[in-house]
């Protein structure tokens, strides 16, 4: 058998003396980072935008600052645990006190489910994301007896609480008399909580109407006029009979629903429809201030405001915001009212002009809008920057409508029964979450659904919140 012979390794020749200079490899060009491109301003920039505003616009065109456009993620989601609920008896008593102020319009012989208990169950179920008669009944059917007892449940026999069904929610809360009372009681309760949690603030009341498109019958959608505070709580809400009238006469009734102490020194804003002299007098009589925009419904006022020498003055304040695929630049100017304006509107202390320019992220101009307005706030109490902040706060009421439509699915709900009562419940839940600093209503509702008989009670303040995880 032939033997395998391994070849001998090749000898490695190493010189006795290494050269003093080793041959160099071809030089590699040193890497020099390219200078960031200087963003070019759009061809059409507001003429009175100052240098700082132009720099802010240039930075916005360069791209968003990482994380700058996102809200800070809160820590309020608070997953449930197995520890017993620590009930807050004072807050529970306060809620039940407001709900017991309602007058039950049913015959006393058929009241198996008290109105205050039914509303308390509906609110707690709403905080768990169950904001319709069917889903609230499902929440109540599975709720622990101890929870329903604390909410005021009457007992069947010695132990079992009475559990309302979907028909009871629809029939009782669908009664307009009960729905309005529930709306008023929940608004009063959330206002009391807001005063405790956020005292000493000049409050901003934003008034706007919202159609409940999902509950439309015969081509007409129910309309609700709401007053929303800047902390996210609802001050009052009233239905609008769109077949006979519009929002204008309901405006003053809405203000009558709000306690005088809450209106004193508050700022009230509304859209062009509510720029009415009667509204201005009503607000001034309440000790509050108004901010109104001017439209075609006040032609003489618009012409007088438009005739002011706006081009002779530079903008006093500005903002630049990037988000939703566009960049918005807003500027504002203020001027004192003329005698022509004061003749019909003696409450006015400032007239303002807001211009908004919207750009695409590439710098192309998407649109421009100019808005004229009046306010009873004097310059020493509200600068141009303050007025711009109030106006942006008013326009953000659309975000509240978006939460009700998307997070709660209000527009997708086809149930016409009890629509006002459950809209009031959504308002109360949203306000409670906002007061605690929830990072997002939809995310908080998802967390509540995972722990439906503990976390909603804690978020409504009826039980103590667990310690936040480290």
Walk through the language-model features, giving the residues of each.
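A C-terminal functional module that forms or caps the active site or interfaces directly
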Residues: 358-433
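An anionic, glycine-rich sequence signature occurring as long contiguous blocks
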Residues: 289-291, 295-392
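Short, conserved catalytic/metal-binding motifs centered on acidic residues
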Residues: 121, 136-137, 165, 169, ...
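Domain-level cores of phosphate- or acyl-group-handling catalytic modules
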Residues: 248, 252-295, 299
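Dynamic "connector" segments at or just before major functional cores
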Residues: 2-206, 229-237, 256, 434-470
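Short, structured patches in soluble enzyme cores that scaffold and shape functional sites
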Residues: 209-211, 229, 239-240, 272, ...
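Electropositive, glycine- and tryptophan-enriched low-complexity nucleic-acid-binding patches
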Residues: 216-264
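Generic secondary-structure signature for well-ordered alpha-helical cores
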Residues: 256, 310-313, 396, 430, ...
């Amino acid at each position: 058998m032939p033997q395998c012979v391994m070849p001998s390794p090749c000898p490695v020749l190493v010189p006795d003396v290494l050269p003093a200079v080793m041959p160099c490899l071809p030089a590699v060009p040193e890497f020099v980072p390219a200078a960031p491109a200087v963003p070019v301003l759009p061809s059409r920039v507001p003429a009175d935008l100052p240098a700082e505003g132009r720099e802010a616009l240039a930075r916005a065109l360069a791209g968003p600052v990482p994380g700058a456009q996102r809200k800070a993620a809160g820590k309020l989601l608070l997953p449930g645990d197995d520890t017993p609920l620590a009930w807050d008896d004072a807050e529970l008593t306060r809620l039940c006190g407001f709900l017991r102020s309602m007058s039950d319009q049913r015959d006393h012989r058929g009241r198996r489910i008290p109105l205050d208990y039914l509303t308390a169950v509906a609110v707690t179920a709403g905080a768990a994301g169950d904001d319709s008669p069917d889903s609230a009944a499902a929440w109540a059917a599975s709720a622990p007896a101890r929870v329903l007892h604390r909410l005021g449940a009457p007992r069947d026999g010695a132990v079992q609480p009475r559990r309302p069904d979907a028909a009871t929610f629809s029939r009782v809360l669908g009664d307009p008399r009960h729905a309005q009372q529930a709306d008023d009681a929940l608004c009063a309760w959330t206002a009391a909580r807001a005063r405790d949690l956020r005292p000493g603030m000049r409050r901003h009341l934003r008034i706007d109407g919202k159609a409940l498109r999902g509950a439309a019958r015969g081509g007409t959608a129910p309309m609700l006029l709401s007053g929303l505070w800047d902390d996210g709580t609802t001050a009052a809400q009233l239905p609008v009979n769109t077949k006979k009238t519009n929002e204008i006469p309901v405006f003053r009734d809405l203000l009558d629903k709000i306690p005088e102490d809450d209106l004193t020194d508050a700022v009230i804003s509304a859209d062009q429809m509510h720029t009415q002299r009667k509204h201005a007098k009503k607000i001034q009589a309440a000790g509050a201030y108004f901010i109104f925009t001017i439209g075609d419904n006040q032609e003489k006022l618009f012409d007088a405001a438009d005739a002011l020498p706006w081009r002779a003055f530079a903008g006093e304040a500005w903002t630049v915001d990037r988000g939703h695929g566009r960049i918005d630049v807003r500027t504002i100017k203020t001027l004192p009212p003329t005698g022509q304006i004061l003749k019909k509107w003696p409450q006015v202390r400032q007239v303002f002009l807001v211009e908004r320019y919207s750009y695409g992220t590439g710098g192309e101009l998407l649109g421009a809008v100019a808005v004229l307005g009046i306010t009873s706030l004097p310059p020493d109490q509200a600068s141009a920057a303050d007025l711009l902040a109030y106006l942006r706060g008013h326009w953000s009421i659309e975000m509240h409508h978006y939460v009700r439509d998307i997070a709660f699915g209000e527009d997708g709900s086809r149930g016409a029964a009890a629509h006002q009562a459950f809209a009031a419940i959504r308002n109360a839940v949203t306000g409670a979450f906002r007061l605690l600093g929830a990072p997002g209503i939809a995310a908080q509702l998802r967390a509540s659904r995972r722990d439906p008989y503990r976390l909603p009670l804690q978020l409504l303040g009826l039980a103590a919140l667990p310690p936040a995880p480290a």
